[in-house]
Each structure stands twice: as structure tokens, then as C-alpha cells.
Design a protein with these regions (language model features):
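Conserved PLP-enzyme active-site core in the AAT-like
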Residues: 1-122
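PLP-dependent enzyme catalytic core of the Aspartate aminotransferase-like
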Residues: 246-283
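Conserved PLP-binding catalytic core of the aspartate aminotransferase-like
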Residues: 201-233
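Short beta-strand
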Residues: 200-205, 241-246
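A generic structural signal for well-ordered alpha-helical segments
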Residues: 63, 193-194, 233-234
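Active-site C-terminal subdomain of aminotransferase-like
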Residues: 66, 91-197
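Short, glycine-/Ser/Thr-/acidic-enriched flexible segments
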Residues: 15-16, 46-48, 77, 104-106, ...
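Alpha-helical scaffolding segments of alpha/beta enzyme cores, especially the outer helices
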Residues: 26, 54-61, 65, 188, ...
Length: 283
């Protein structure tokens, strides 16, 4: 928004890596007391690391009370709405004033392919500009189609074609199956890791990201072990997984989006990580 870092207030998260709603309320009220004007709250529908989903319904009530705009960053998690099994996790997303969607994430399309959805289409009028050389007023009145009003850069690529073709090919049921499969695989992987005393899982996945770490009984240097295992997975086994930090500890981050992934492959991966971790532990 071009307001500078000083205008952005970071809100703490709870133990499940979701926005702390009580902290949000307190920060908004403090801003008002300090003479500031809080006008926008951003909920995350699928955080980058943990895939956590903020409670949009409660945030909406707060935003209505203080006349704030509610935006949902659903770049990662927007596809959950198409899963018949898991769509309830996005309860209240319809209450948002605007939503960000990245079709190049859960929808598996080539980058870049993103969209901003707004509840009130007239919101885009803020982008409207008229000039003799650009989007003349009389042209608009005569019904000419012009993409000037559709983006800040006054034009855009035909990325919508990717979305249209994929939905024509797969349909709602096809996407529901793909997204549900990825989320169910994440639940399975989480459960298997939770039952394995060699691993600590940071939080229960809400979408398809599982964040975990190997726990060593022989050394306190588990951070280096997890880093080493990640490198070995890449260079020796062709397995690419992410890395992040939680509570000061290095963790591995596995985001499942491939609908062809099976439980057997996930079991093999868990066993491989455990084997490599124990080898690193000895060295």
C-alpha cells in the first residue's frame, strides 16, 4: 500500500500458528487510543510455513465494529473451498472484502497466475483513470473494452486462460479430488510422524504443509542434523523439502501438492529421513 513499515502492525500468533485474535483486538484498540486510524486487517488462509488458517469469522466481527477492511491472503489456501471434505475450514471467507488467490499454488498452474477477488466490483473504480491517450471517457460510454481499469499496471497477460482451461478440463469435482487428496496425504504424514518417537511435529496441518524435525537422543545439535539430512535428501536422493525455524529450532517443511503421492511413498520418505538422521547422529 506504500505506507511504510511503520504503518504495519504485526500481530502475534498462538500455539497453532494462527493470528492471536485477542492480541489483534488489543492492538486495534491501542492504535485508536494513540490517535491512529486502523483501516485494514489481513487474515492468512494458509501461512507459507505451516499452512495455518486464521479465524476469518471472528476477525470479520472485529472489522465491522471498527469499520476496517478485511482482506484474506488466500494465495496458498484458497483451493480448500473446492474440497467437499475440508471446505468447512474456510468458514467465513465470504465475509472478507477482498481475497487474494494464487492459481500457481494449490491449483498447480504455471507461474504467474493470480487474482484479486472483491465483494463489491465498484471497488475497482479506484483504479480508473481517463486521459486523451488512455481509456477515454467516451470510449467507456460507447462500450469499448479496456483493461486499464483491471490492474495497477494498466494491462495484464492472458493468465486467465490457464484458469479457464484447467476448470474446463477438470471441473469442480476434479479439483475437489486433487485438493482433497493432497490434504488427506498431509494428515496421514502428520499422523505417522506423530506416532514416531524420533520426530516432533510442530503443529497439526490444516492444509497440506507438515513442519517437523528429527529429535536426537545422543546430541543437542539437532539443528545441524536436520540441516544435513535436508542436504542429503536433495543431493543423494533427489528429494526436495523445505526448511524453516520454529521456536528457535531448525525444522523440515514438507508441502504436499502432488495428487499422485501415495501413503507408501510417504512411509518410505519418513523411513529415509529417520535413517539419514541416525547416520548423521553417529557422525
Amino acid at each position: 500500500l506504500g505506507l511504510g513499515y511503520q504503518s504495519v502492525v504485526k500481530v502475534p500468533v498462538d500455539k497453532n500458528k494462527k493470528m492471536d485474535r485477542q492480541a489483534l483486538k488489543q492492538l486495534v484498540e491501542k492504535d485508536i487510543q494513540d490517535g491512529n486510524i486502523p483501516f485494514l486487517a489481513v487474515a492468512t488462509i494458509g501461512t507459507t510455513d505451516f499452512g495455518s488458517i486464521d479465524n476469518v469469522k471472528e476477525m470479520s466481527e472485529l472489522c465491522k465494529k471498527y469499520n476496517m477492511w478485511l482482506h484474506a491472503d488466500a494465495a496458498y489456501g484458497s483451493g480448500v473451498i473446492l474440497s467437499e471434505e475440508y471446505k468447512h475450514r474456510l468458514e467465513g471467507i465470504n465475509l472478507c472484502d477482498s481475497i487474494t488467490v494464487d492459481f500457481h499454488k494449490m491449483f498447480l498452474l504455471p507461474i504467474s497466475c493470480s487474482a484479486v477477488l472483491v465483494k463489491d466490483g465498484s471497488t475497482f473504480d479506484a483504479l480508473t483513470i481517463h486521459a486523451d491517450y488512455l481509456n477515454r471517457q467516451e470510449d467507456e460510454e460507447d462500450g469499448y473494452t479496456n483493461l486499464v481499469d483491471k490492474s495497477l499496471q494498466t494491462t495484464r497477460r492472458f493468465d486467465a486462460l490457464k484458469v479457464w482451461i484447467s476448470f474446463q478440463a477438470r471441473g469442480k469435482d476434479g479439483w475437489s479430488k486433487i485438493i482433497t487428496t493432497s490434504m488427506s496425504n498431509a494428515q496421514y504424514f502428520y499422523q505417522q510422524l506423530s506416532n514416531d518417537k524420533n520426530f516432533e511435529v510442530i503443529t497439526k496441518p490444516e492444509i497440506s504443509s507438515v513442519v517437523f524435525r528429527y529429535i536426537s537422543e545422543k546430541t543437542e545439535n539437532t539443528d545441524e542434523i536436520n540441516k544435513k539430512v535436508r542436504r542429503q535428501l536433495l543431493h543423494n536422493h533427489g528429494v526436495v523439502i523445505g526448511q524453516t525455524v520454529s521456536n528457535g529450532h531448525v525444522c523440515l517443511n514438507f508441502t504436499l501438492l502432488n495428487p499422485l503421492m501415495t501413503h507408501e511413498k510417504l512411509d518410505s520418505l519418513r523411513e529415509l529421513i529417520c535413517q539419514l538422521s541416525k547416520q548423521a547422529e553417529e557422525n
